[in-house]
């Protein structure tokens, strides 16, 4: 029985019921006391894989919790589901497609069949095509319409054609190649285009239009704006091919735009947008960091793929993180999850993981179309430390919601300044420690008395200084951010999302909810510009249309 055809209702499994009973046993569990009772707790609940060190000891778990979660994964036939994905089965059931972003990072010589055809030769042909293009640009051989070498590459794309590539190219800035600057244009807001164009020279700018359909509204409008800007700056239609390339499965539309066929990189139906940075969608990454580092990124992801497929569940990073997510969401009532990178270069990882997790697991029906019987994807949010400590960490520490968190931190910085990195690392650890330890009423009172405050003032202030603690977190440590480790980190989160989708019985690889707004947007636009006179479907939308039409000037 295939999970994507007949998904299990995990809530009916014996292990799910056992976990529900176990949750009640842990009602008074305190992590602070657990560390006192078990000096080996850190060693028991931490390990390394693929260049990542995971400490999951600061969680609301005992060893029997992990045993029960692993039992849940086994009863849900997670191993079969993992095998089905890597074997190319059509696990995206609603669209009847395989899910094979993992094929993009497999070595040459491997064999992956889609409809009986081995796709690996085509994968490596495109990688070779990327290698040639990046080499031409970096060596100054790709010239603009005035024969000047390209100095700026602009990626025009949105969603998965933007978030993943932006994350990687900025996370790996220490590896940026000299002579070529990379930029991203995603939003349809004209101000974004204006600000970017003001920093560019049309003679030396290459645009990458990334859209599977070559019809994504925001991307097409920005591509048209870039084309008009290029022509206004002195470029010609005849030389347009020097300044525009495409990543798309709609070759005809890209050619009609003016892009030469040999400069169109393919996309495949078996790679979803939010999983596509490993494909030619990653061209801006390769332009930024060089093709050899891009291949290191692929290698790191491949290493995580191997770990995911072969490591026992109790020592499998994506499996454990996925199980812990289900533990908190379905048994502790957690509705969100914080991503807290303590590294400036990783500042965009939360944006990418928001799409990866929320677009994948933001579902309310199972693979077979029946309603889910459990909670599904959480809200993903967060941001770079230490900034968050002076903003939303207050809610993490003293708010009423249980919000699990992932701390991500490197041991070494590429840019050491005095003892800044030691303080950064210390802040990361102390935040996870504070979430776990908290501060009792007795400790708060003792602290205030030690400052010499009168007893009345101690009693007045003490309740405000109590911090509940017992808030769960994981800490992921890398020695230093590199292409290989970053590839492993991103692939880890991809697989974590898949694990959770299996336990919830949902399809992590479609996104039908995104389409409704697009469809309605066309009607709203027609009414805004006056080409559609019938009123909108509701009074609120029509009122806002009227407000715009009564005030908009140009």
Curated annotation (Swiss-Prot):
The UniProt record lists the EC number as 5.3.1.9
Q: Where is the signal peptide?
A: none
A single Gene Ontology biological process assigned to it is: gluconeogenesis
The record's annotation in CDD domains points to: SIS_PGI_1, SIS_PGI_2
Reaction(s) this enzyme catalyzes, per UniProt: alpha-D-glucose 6-phosphate = beta-D-fructose 6-phosphate
The record ties this protein, via Gene3D superfamilies, to: 1.10.1390.10, Glucose-6-phosphate isomerase like protein, domain 1
Protein location: Cytoplasm
The active site lies at 359 (proton donor), 390, 518
Give the protein's biological function. Answer: Catalyzes the reversible isomerization of glucose-6-phosphate to fructose-6-phosphate.
Full protein name: Glucose-6-phosphate isomerase
